[in-house]
Amino acid sequence: MEMSLRLASSSTSNPICLLNPGKNLNFPIRNHRIPKTSKPFCVRSSMSLSKPPRQTLSSNWDVSSFSIDSVAQSPSRLPSFEELDTTNMLLRQRIVFLGSQVDDMTADLVISQLLLLDAEDSERDITLFINSPGGSITAGMGIYDAMKQCKADVSTVCLGLAASMGAFLLASGSKGKRYCMPNSKVMIHQPLGTAGGKATEMSIRIREMMYHKIKLNKIFSRITGKPESEIESDTDRDNFLNPWEAKEYGLIDAVIDDGKPGLIAPIGDGTPPPKTKVWDLWKVEGTKKDNTNLPSERSMTQNGYAAIE
């Protein structure tokens, strides 16, 4: 590409015209082109910037490799944000943690992690830690199906509380690999839900709820070896079990560190709490101390409250 530049001779302010008076200057100006080289321009540094090979989930990855000494010796090898993420670090140890209510988002995350670990290595166990108050039945059944789909054994461990659908997932682990910590709690009950709207819509919701109840009772019966009638009776109300009761019931196989001194929180001797003054006023019903403003023991029993012995 060329450009033609003409400078008038009458322009005295132009220094080129002053040097060449009475002449018209007409010369081309060409764009400067950088010659191509055979090798790209590069900068070499005395310090090597080569990155170590990327770790995979199936590799033998150890958190202790990120020690202070190793970072001081190799400042170019600092752990990335993804590597320091607790979920990512647990996945490298084949650990999945369910630490919230069971909903659709939590179920999607747990299912994807289970399928990923099973695809990485189907010969090694997957450990599912549970500390959940329960939640959606459909979301929990999705996790249950993913656990059964995995070729690898899924070991379940209860930390804190495994209630409702959390207890169901705890009991659904591989036989012989279901555990509870000694201070944890397990709670089982029948499905909960609400129904509203038109009578037809309510009947549909109630029928669906009864379907889930029968299905869960059948699975619990197969897991624990108890008849469905007993499961239905035991789950009629909230049924809280300590780790040893859950083991005897068939929900788990063992209590971790059972009998280790100092690990188990002290349990009361079973002595009932002292009775209040209200109880004394109830007992003297019909005497001079009778307070007509207090409900009688008979009315409490009729309203659904069991009498206290």
From Swiss-Prot:
InterPro entries: ClpP (IPR001907), ClpP/crotonase-like_dom_sf (IPR029045), ClpP/TepA (IPR023562), ClpP_His_AS (IPR033135), ClpP_Ser_AS (IPR018215)
Tissue: Mostly expressed in leaves. Also detected in stems, and to a lower extent, in roots (at protein level).
UniProt modification remark: Ubiquitinated in vitro by CHIP.
Active-site residues per Swiss-Prot or TrEMBL entry: 164 (nucleophile), 189
Compartmental location: Plastid, Chloroplast stroma
N-acetylvaline: residues carrying this PTM: 71
PROSITE patterns assigned to the protein according to its UniProt record, in alphabetical order: CLP_PROTEASE_HIS, CLP_PROTEASE_SER
Modified residues (Phosphothreonine): 194
Gene Ontology biological-process annotations: proteolysis
Keyword Plastid included in the entry's annotation: yes
Expression triggers: Repressed in darkness. Accumulates during leaf senescence. Induced during cold acclimation (at protein level).
Catalytic activity: Hydrolysis of proteins to small peptides in the presence of ATP and magnesium. alpha-casein is the usual test substrate. In the absence of ATP, only oligopeptides shorter than five residues are hydrolyzed (such as succinyl-Leu-Tyr-|-NHMec, and Leu-Tyr-Leu-|-Tyr-Trp, in which cleavage of the -Tyr-|-Leu- and -Tyr-|-Trp bonds also occurs)
Any one Gene Ontology molecular-function term assigned to this protein's record: ATP-dependent peptidase activity
Keywords: Acetylation, Chloroplast, Hydrolase, Phosphoprotein, Plastid, Protease, Serine protease, Transit peptide, Ubl conjugation
HAMAP family in UniProt: ClpP (MF_00444)
Function: Cleaves peptides in various proteins in a process that requires ATP hydrolysis. Has a chymotrypsin-like activity. Plays a major role in the degradation of misfolded proteins. In the absence of CLPP3, modified ClpPR core(s) could be formed, albeit at strongly reduced levels.
The family this protein is said to belong to: Belongs to the peptidase S14 family.
Name by which UniProt lists this protein: ATP-dependent Clp protease proteolytic subunit 3, chloroplastic
Species of the source: Arabidopsis thaliana (Mouse-ear cress)
